[in-house]
């Protein structure tokens, strides 16, 4: 027998319980009863009457199970559209076939029929109709519509939602409605805690119509699975699906709670930020509006201390990030909420050099946020200004103008200027250093007694000399021991030279003072010349008559009084 025909009963000309026979379109095994063999050959032999005769004589075969646990009823139910007939299904039920016996995979005849409808795209209209009639017949004869297999999956959701996916795709709610009309519990959960509604929202592109249907059958919109995830969370997680916005609105209007938290503390709104579907930014924005409109609390934190505002700060798309943050702030999000590290959303924005932030956006944010909040390490937002960011000089300037404290100290006593001198490496950072120096107290020291200048000295980048120069020009002083570092040696030499020059200048000034004191003493020749000249110019002959000219005439070499006057005038012309 070829592989192509291995599931075709036509190739099996005689019965043997040890032979392998097909029992459905993709299954085959041994240990068939003669009744099972006759069922798969019914349409070939036109053998319904043969089955009746055999069953009358062999009723003990009615619930016999083959090697895979399938009964004659299971085989007849799933092949009633192509190998046997629905009349045979009814015949078996009338003769005591048990519709609730499970096969070795934990599936009953009804579950197998419903599962066959997942291949609805492969079926013709009459085949689909036949399966629906078979399902209804099994229910009429006591099939348990709430039966759960070994994985806890019920008839409706045991295929992990694929049943519903196919049914919805082909606009066929008939089997779902049949089950619900016959008291199927829509809130039964499987071993993972997922209900029918969970599976719908996980596996389907469109959920609106099935949600509307289930709302008529007391479905629990807030049912949680073992991870405490709700249906609303899954819809938000897969918000990129085309109709999820409408489905979310439908759930919220009918009482879905947006503030339930899963085992990690995440709410439905937080799931909007788990994946970055940039092309669906409008969907995300509209869903956030809906959730807030129906009472979502934007300030709930998950187990990691993250709120939706903190999550929004990680959105990569700048336009989307800005608009969502603005919307959240306008609608009650706490601007100063912090994560477990004490970081605010503004700190997270500023510290990432990839985030482009305009002055307009920062001015808007500063209406709400306190920039002087410190994280768990004692840092304020200025400590997080990054290196090499295009926007950071403008952002830094605006923050400094907004009275953000430039002298705030972290847990190691370091100021923003100290950290900047330590970590900045780009020539673009020199502008930021200048700004921080302008607003900061540069003489502050950390817990180890280090100043910003010390941090600049230990910076090994190309801008070290610029930073050191800026600090020295601002008035800082270099006070370290000579090291092997050439710059340290140079600065120390400059410092020692500066000290020597200061001492030299002091010495010269003292020499000048003492020299003037000596030159201008009353008994000096210089003083006497100036005194006599002053008397002559002012015609004070009385004082002049009292002067002793002998020493002066001898010093100047004058022969008489008139000659003395001439020599005095000549000497005065050369005095400074």
UniProtKB/Swiss-Prot annotation:
ANK repeats lie at residues 68-101, 118-147, 159-188, 192-223, 227-260, 264-300, 304-337, 341-373, 377-408, 412-446, 448-480. InterPro entries: Ankyrin_rpt (IPR002110), Ankyrin_rpt-contain_sf (IPR036770). Keywords: ANK repeat, Repeat. PROSITE patterns: ANK_REP_REGION, ANK_REPEAT. It holds the Pfam family Ank. Gene3D superfamilies: Ankyrin repeat-containing domain. Signal peptide: none annotated. This is Putative ankyrin repeat protein L86. It comes from Acanthamoeba polyphaga mimivirus (APMV). The lineage of its organism: Viruses, Varidnaviria, Bamfordvirae, Nucleocytoviricota, Megaviricetes.
